[in-house]
């Protein structure tokens, strides 16, 4: 496990939850995750769930992705997706607004790995260097990814070589995030 990434993720999640509590006097609320089982759910309304992060309880790696491609995945990615269960978190990095992807449950974790495999299949077909996404942006074809060769974090336009360097590593990126409510 990449301890710096785990610590940075936990600290950012705490900053987000604290900001949410300051603004709304509650734990974070999600309408999108209503009806989807998770250990994060602390209460439910008629159309939303209140959630709080919980320790990840599954296998602490994304080995299914490694096995699918016979490659070694950056340790920061293993850590990012297996440190905690949480709802997706809205954030800002500089002037970039993003949604930091999180695993909501063990079922969701399997789906995330399938999506990472699909992403890598497309990159391999297009002969692009391998990246693994960690966040979505408002523009559908752009994501925040970790380069599997270097570990750097970049803004990537899907299906192209267009990448903008954002941080040298995932912990550095997470430490610079600001919560968006």
Swiss-Prot record:
Domain of life, source organism: Bacteria
Record's keyword terms, sorted: Cell inner membrane, Cell membrane, Membrane
Membrane topology: Peripheral membrane protein
InterPro entries cross-referenced by the UniProt entry: Syd, Syd_sf
Gene3D superfamilies: Syd protein
Keyword Nucleotide-binding applies: no
Location in the cell: Cell inner membrane
Keyword ATP-binding: no
Coiled coil residues, start to end: none
Chief localization: membrane
GO CC annotations, alphabetized: cytoplasmic side of plasma membrane
Family the entry assigns: Belongs to the Syd family.
Function: Interacts with the SecY protein in vivo. May bind preferentially to an uncomplexed state of SecY, thus functioning either as a chelating agent for excess SecY in the cell or as a regulatory factor that negatively controls the translocase function.
NCBIfam families per UniProt: PRK04968.1
Name assigned to this protein: Protein Syd
């Amino acid at each position: 496990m990449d301890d710096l990434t785990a610590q940075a993720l936990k600290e950012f999640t705490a900053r987000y939850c604290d900001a949410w509590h300051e603004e709304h006097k509650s734990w974070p609320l999600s309408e999108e995750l209503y009806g989807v089982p998770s250990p994060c759910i602390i209460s439910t309304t008629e159309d939303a769930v209140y959630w709080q992060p919980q320790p990840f309880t599954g296998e602490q790696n994304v080995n299914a992705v490694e096995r699918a491609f016979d490659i070694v995945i950056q340790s920061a990615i293993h850590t990012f997706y297996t440190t905690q269960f949480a709802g997706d978190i809205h954030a800002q990095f500089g002037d970039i607004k993003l949604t930091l992807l999180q695993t909501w449950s063990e079922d969701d974790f399997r789906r995330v790995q399938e999506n990472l495999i699909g992403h890598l299949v497309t990159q391999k077909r297009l002969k692009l260097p391998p990246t693994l996404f960690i966040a979505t942006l408002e523009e559908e074809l752009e994501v925040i990814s970790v380069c599997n060769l270097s570990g750097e974090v970049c803004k990537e336009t899907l299906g192209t070589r267009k990448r903008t360097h954002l941080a040298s590593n995932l912990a550095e990126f997470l430490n610079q995030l600001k919560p968006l409510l």
